[in-house]
Every structure is written in structure tokens, then in C-alpha cells.
């Protein structure tokens, strides 16, 4: 289920009978609508939500209004109901704990935030590995470590999100994009190129064109360090990648012209930003040389 597609269908005038019937999927659609700014859809979706999910939506609205007190009240209520004997829901409980972690981090309660997010990661993994919320929890755990300067631990969290599944393609792509930024900061540029390549193609597969353009431009910008027909093609480099041992030299930062040509041709008609055009002009010159 792609919540973006469902939101698009609702905006086109289709009725709520199109809402998915799986566990918590209407909640996912409602949150997508809020995230896209289509709050006018929420009144129609609300009858499809259970009591716990309704309080999560109230939490979302409180965040939109920068009302931290109401946000905490809504989460507390949702968490209490999710733990009740009558309406126990382990997956929603874990999701709420993740949200508590995010909220606590924003309030400066960093240690407790980490406890909440870690609990959510472990719980959702046990309940439904690869679920959308499992991926979100891992991404938030990585961000928590990154904000503490724990780059290795952040990368370890991203490594938990395998490109071979079971996580959603958009989760994998977001993870690889974030991992690339960490690797760039560590000056591990060829590893960053591999991650940007995976992110770019995953974003394309997920119809996230803006993110695909950004990742692709960044890949070209780094890759123009050296363009050589002796360089491994990126898919080969990805499949043959192995962890480096301590003391091993960093891989050469270079790309194959076939990969550059593919990326250039895909991007050329999809951006008119001056900075992007400059990068593409450099790519064109490299391909002509």
C-alpha cells in the first residue's frame, strides 16, 4: 500500500471505500495526508480509525500547532489505551514509544529519547520486521546516534536496513541517502557514491523524483573527482563491496563514464536549478573529454 497514491485518489474525489483495510493502514494514510498538508481529508478518514489511532492524529495536530503540552497529553492517552486489557495493541504501543522518543529529543530529554526509540526498534522488529514503522524507528535511532556524534553507531543502524528487504524501498533509499552524508563527513567518498547510487535508484522506483534528482546530482558532484573507463561500474562496485579492515587504504574515488552518461541523461530534463545546471555542465564536459 502506497499512502501517497491513496491520498491522491482521495483528493481526486474517490470515496473512503478505497481506504485500505489492513491493520493501521488508514492511520498511515491519515498521517500522509497531514504530512502533505491535506488536512481537509482527515474528517473523512477518522471514522476508519480506532480510539488509539485517533489520539495519534490528535498528537499530529498538536505538533502542527507547536503545542507540546497537548502533544504529550495525546501520546499519554494513546499509550495508556494501547496497554489496556480491553484494547491492547503491541504494535501501536511500540509506534507511540517511538513518537515519545522523537518528542523527548525535541524537548532536550536526549537520554530518555534514546531509551524510547531503542525500545520501539526492538519491539517492532519482533512484531513485524520490515514494517514501515520498523524502518522509521531505525532511521530515528540512527539520527539519535548521529546527534550524539556517534557516527559508527548511526551507520550500524542504517546497516540494519538491508537493500535486499524486507524494508520498503523508500525506507532503504532514505537510509542510504542519510548514510551517504555520514560517509562524506568521514571522507569515505567511494562508499558514499555507492550509497547515493542506491538511494537515487530507489527514489526513482518509489516515484520520489525530487529526492532522486538531489541524490543523483550529489553522486555526479562527487564522482567527477575522476571519470575513467577503467573504473568499475557502480552496480558491480555495490555487489562486490566488502567491509574494510583497519588500516586498509580508502578506495579510489572514481566513476565509469557509462554510469555518468546514464545519470546525466536522466537528470538533464528534470532540473533547472542554477547549481544543478552547473554540475550537469561539468558532467557533460567530462563525457566529451
What are these regions (language model features)?
Residues 33, 62, 97, 104, ...:
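Residue at a conserved register position within TPR or TPR-like alpha-solenoid repeats
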Residues 43, 47, 76-84, 118-126, ...:
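Amphipathic alpha-helical segments of tetratricopeptide repeats
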Residues 29, 58, 93, 100, ...:
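Structural register within alpha-helical repeat arrays
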Residues 20, 49, 91, 132, ...:
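Residue signature of alpha-solenoid helical repeat architecture, marking inter-repeat boundaries
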Residues 1-25, 216, 223-289:
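C-terminal non-catalytic interaction modules
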